[in-house]
């Protein structure tokens, strides 16, 4: 919509000046909900009002007419803005905050009584650019991402920034891994070029990952423009100052900096030079696997019942975020993993220190986000106090280490706690200047201690002792004049005045007493001294707030100079919190230090599922542990057994153990030896993807296809019931061929659970495959699931027993047992069908032999063909011959 169409739609020419001002600002922010400050309210008009009233659950009213059209309106109190912003941001809306830049009095002085108060947008709030503590989750990052896919489409670039903590990163990602990387980052908002709007990728980001996409015009990603933005922002002369970065990385960094500048109205915190991330330095976990394993959120989108929720006993917000990042990005470098494990082991061996540190960490604050608010002029005195208390606690924490170890700490611990020495100068600055009972709002005053600045003390003295100052002056004038009845009074016409009776006029001899007014019985005077006192009393509140703001800004500027140190301190405290947390859960839940190797070992003794175990503990039940022994020679376990017996739990627990080990934590097992896993893939559960119009089976096949395409020799695959969404013969055939492919081509570690007992014969010709099943006890018709994984193969699934447990009518259960008995009698053996009896002699349909024969005949035929000598008729005949060979 162009400006002419916009003005015509909203009857601009007949609108009031105030409404014209609103429309001018709205046209410049058509992609936003515009909150327009009017006195004590933020108002919304027209379509914005209709939409916001529904989202916020507030009344929709009208504000007169614009021409013949009634103007829809709704509003929220300015002091409750954050409450309503939370709802709008959670609903994925972009919000422009339009503030009054002057008071109504200023407007009158500028342009008379008809002047409209000057207003403009001071900030645009989007899901990816929030910094307010009440609007964002404290225990996870709040990323804004920018994505560029170069024309060659081989490698994409992603830049991601957490504005609330002033962290920025850039990574190159293979095109096939874009969705996996975005699933790892879980950004609140993604910037992409307009030319991707109709792409399959954008569709997948929105529908599969449910992330907000903000489309930007293509020019926002132009390399020359982005390069200039970067150089200007970091005050550099050469782009090499960023490091060795690709053209697409320049584009994503530049585009994200420009977006921050536009939304924050140039008020961007200092961002460090982007940290270049190596995509291969952490484990790849695709979106489906993250969902299936409930790593950071459960299937309902909540953290309850997730792995993160189970092992997160951190005591600080920044520690919680670091643990979130650890879990989202397990390492793949053995040296780095072992470094983390050594730190965990140190704290596990010093649990008394851990207990003391955790108590002290509770006294620290989220100074990363405090510092960002300070640098963006959106802080309160509470942020400064948070820094002060954190500095104090940090110094004590360092003392705890010194008391226990003196100067004999391991180097890797010494490096972590080095920033804890504190900054005495900064601590004393805040301690001496900021009141302990500081209000949240700077406009309320009462931030600065009276003794910090003499003028502050003087003004507060005036405010708090108004009557005393007037009484003091009254006593002085009584002595000077000898008039004992002299009073100092006040009215709204002449303000403060000296009041004497008419008979005492002849005693007023000093010319400093200036006549103001005579009444029937009294005469009123003033003095320069009294006028000054009155002016000070009238202006004291305004003056003290103004002075306190200036002093506060100066103190903040001193804090900003220490930003680099404070960020190091925040990092140190978060690292301490995470590793003390690892030691705590290792002790609390009996976890063990894993051994990491560079082979295909996966040797878990008495492994447990941490989430399920915790749930059972609350119910006073015990978790049944299980072993898992995979190696290069025996790398596939084919697991059969009844439903509800624990197959899926076993699959998940081993994937989770690998993840926990590679973040540097001890693991829930008696012992664990794990060859580093580069990628984990899972195919568990069944659900129709109704949004995409995909059936359960299609969704399953797409996931399985992606797993087979992306896995490497060092990957860990867990598959549950592949092929169950179609007919039995189709399902068995697919499951069989998938197992063959994993065994022969990928040669990676795999746990494969199935109800297709026909597959259990595959160990006869797949040497790396072993059969395992779930132990049960049968007593007549009663069955007890023991949940133990044992060597061997199941010959039935006990599905009817599970159906009975689910409460199906007895008549249905009895009939099902009759039908099952008939099927078993007509089969070639209990629990087997024709596929399994024939499979000892051939790998399913002898595909490999047939394919080789066909291929050799086709190759021989192709060698005899000379394309340049073929006529159209001969070419057609040749096609028919080739078809016969196939």
Curated annotation (Swiss-Prot):
Q: List the disulfide bonds.
A: none
- Is Nucleotide-binding among the key words of this record? yes
Please tell me where ATP binds in this chain.
641-648
- Tell me any Pfam family this protein matches: MutS_III
Q: InterPro entries per the record?
A: DNA_mismatch_repair_MutS, DNA_mismatch_repair_MutS-lik_N, DNA_mismatch_repair_MutS/MSH, DNA_mismatch_repair_MutS_C, DNA_mismatch_repair_MutS_clamp, DNA_mismatch_repair_MutS_core, DNA_mismatch_repair_MutS_N, DNA_mismatch_repair_MutS_sf
Q: Which domain of life is it from?
A: Bacteria
GO annotation, biological process: mismatch repair
**Which keywords label this protein?**
ATP-binding, DNA damage, DNA repair, DNA-binding, Nucleotide-binding
In its UniProt entry, what is this protein called?
DNA mismatch repair protein MutS
Coiled coil, from the record: none
Record gene name: mutS
Q: Name one GO molecular function term.
A: damaged DNA binding
User: What is the purpose of this protein?
Assistant: This protein is involved in the repair of mismatches in DNA. It is possible that it carries out the mismatch recognition step. This protein has a weak ATPase activity.
Q: Which family does it belong to?
A: Belongs to the DNA mismatch repair MutS family.
């Amino acid at each position: 919509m162009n400006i002419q169409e916009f003005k015509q739609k909203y009857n601009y020419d007949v609108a009031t000046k105030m409404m014209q001002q609103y429309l001018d600002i709205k046209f410049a922010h058509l992609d936003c909900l515009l909150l327009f400050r009017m006195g004590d309210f933020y108002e919304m008009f027209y379509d914005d009002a209709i939409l916001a009233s529904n989202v916020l659950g507030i009344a929709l009213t009208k504000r007169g007419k614009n021409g013949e059209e009634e103007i829809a309106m709704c509003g929220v109190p300015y002091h409750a803005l954050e409450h309503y912003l939370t709802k709008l941001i959670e609903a994925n809306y972009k919000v422009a905050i339009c503030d009054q830049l002057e008071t109504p009095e200023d407007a009158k002085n500028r342009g008379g009584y008809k002047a409209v108060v000057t207003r403009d947008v001071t900030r645009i709030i989007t899901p990816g650019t929030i910094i307010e503590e009440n609007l964002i989750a404290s225990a996870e990052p709040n990323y804004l991402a920018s994505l560029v896919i170069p024309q060659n489409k081989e490698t994409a670039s992603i830049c991601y920034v957490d504005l609330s903590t002033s962290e920025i990163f850039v990574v190159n990602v293979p095109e096939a891994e874009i969705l996996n990387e975005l699933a790892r980052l879980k950004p609140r908002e993604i910037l992409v070029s307009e030319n991707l709007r109709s792409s399959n990728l954008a569709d997948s980001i929105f529908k599969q990952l449910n992330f907000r996409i903000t489309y930007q015009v293509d020019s926002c990603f132009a390399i020359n423009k982005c390069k200039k933005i970067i150089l200007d922002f970091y005050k550099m002369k050469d782009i090499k100052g960023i490091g060795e970065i690709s053209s697409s990385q320049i584009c994503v960094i530049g585009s994200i900096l420009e977006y921050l500048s536009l939304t924050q109205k140039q008020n961007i915190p200092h961002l460090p030079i982007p940290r270049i991330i190596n995509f291969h330095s952490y484990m790849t976990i695709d979106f489906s696997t993250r969902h299936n394993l409930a790593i950071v959120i459960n299937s309902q989108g909540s953290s309850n019942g997730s792995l993160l929720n189970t092992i997160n006993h951190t005591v600080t917000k920044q520690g919680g975020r670091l643990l979130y990042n650890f879990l989202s990005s397990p390492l793949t470098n053995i040296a780095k993993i072992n470094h983390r494990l050594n730190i965990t082991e140190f704290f596990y061996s010093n649990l008394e220190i851990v207990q003391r540190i955790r108590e002290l960490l509770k006294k620290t604050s989220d100074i990363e986000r405090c510092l960002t608010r300070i640098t963006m002029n959106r802080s309160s005195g509470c942020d400064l106090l948070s820094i002060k208390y954190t500095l104090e606690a940090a110094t004590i924490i360092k003392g705890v280490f010194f008391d226990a170890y003196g100067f004999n700490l391991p180097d890797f611990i010494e490096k972590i706690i080095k920033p804890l020495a504190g900054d005495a100068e900064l601590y004393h600055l805040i301690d001496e200047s900021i009141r302990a009972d500081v209000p949240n709002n700077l406009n309320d005053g009462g931030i600065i201690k009276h003794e910090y600045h003499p003028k502050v003390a003087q003004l507060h003295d005036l405010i708090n002792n108004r009557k005393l100052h007037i009484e003091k002056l009254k006593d002085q004038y009584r002595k000077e004049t000898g008039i004992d009845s002299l009073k100092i009074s006040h009215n709204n016409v002449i303000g403060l005045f000296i009041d004497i009776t008419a008979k005492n006029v002849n005693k007023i001899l000093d010319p400093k007493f200036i006549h103001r007014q005579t009444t029937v019985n009294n005469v009123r005077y003033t003095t320069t001294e009294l006028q000054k006192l009155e002016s000070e009393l009238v202006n004291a509140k305004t003056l003290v707030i103004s002075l306190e703001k200036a002093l506060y800004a100066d103190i903040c500027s001193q804090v900003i100079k220490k930003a680099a140190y404070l960020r190091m301190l925040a990092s140190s405290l978060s690292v301490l919190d995470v590793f003390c947390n690892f030691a705590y859960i290792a002790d609390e839940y009996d976890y063990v230090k894993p051994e990491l190797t560079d082979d295909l070992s996966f040797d878990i003794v008495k492994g447990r599922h941490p989430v399920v175990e915790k749930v059972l503990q609350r119910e006073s039940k015990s978790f049944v542990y299980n072993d898992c022994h995979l190696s290069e020679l025996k790398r596939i376990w084919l697991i059969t057994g009844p439903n509800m017996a624990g197959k899926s739990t076993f699959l998940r627990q081993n994937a989770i153990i690998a993840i926990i080990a590679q973040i540097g934590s001890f693991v829930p097992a008696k012992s664990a030896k794990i060859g580093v896993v580069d990628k984990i893939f899972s195919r568990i559960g069944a659900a129709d993807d109704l949004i995409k119009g995909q059936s359960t089976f299609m969704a399953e096949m797409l996931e399985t296809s992606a797993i087979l395409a992306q896995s490497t020799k060092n990957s860990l695959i867990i598959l549950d019931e592949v092929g169950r969404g179609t007919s039995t013969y189709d399902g068995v055939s697919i499951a069989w061929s998938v197992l063959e492919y994993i065994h022969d081509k990928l040669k990676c570690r795999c746990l494969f659970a199935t109800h297709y007992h026909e597959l259990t014969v595959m160990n006869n010709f797949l040497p790396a495959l072993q059969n395992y099943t779930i132990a049960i006890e049968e007593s007549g018709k009663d069955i007890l699931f023991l949940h133990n994984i044992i060597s061997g193969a199941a010959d039935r699934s006990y599905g009817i027993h599970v159906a009975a447990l689910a409460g199906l009518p007895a008549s249905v259960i009895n009939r099902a047992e009759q039908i099952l008995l008939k099927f078993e009698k007509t089969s070639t053996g209990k629990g087997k069908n024709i596929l399994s009896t024939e499979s000892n002699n051939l790998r399913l349909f002898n595909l490999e032999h047939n394919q080789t024969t066909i291929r050799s005949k086709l190759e021989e035929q192709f060698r005899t063909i000379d394309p340049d000598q073929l006529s159209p008729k001969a070419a057609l005949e040749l096609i028919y011959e080739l078809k016969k060979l196939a």
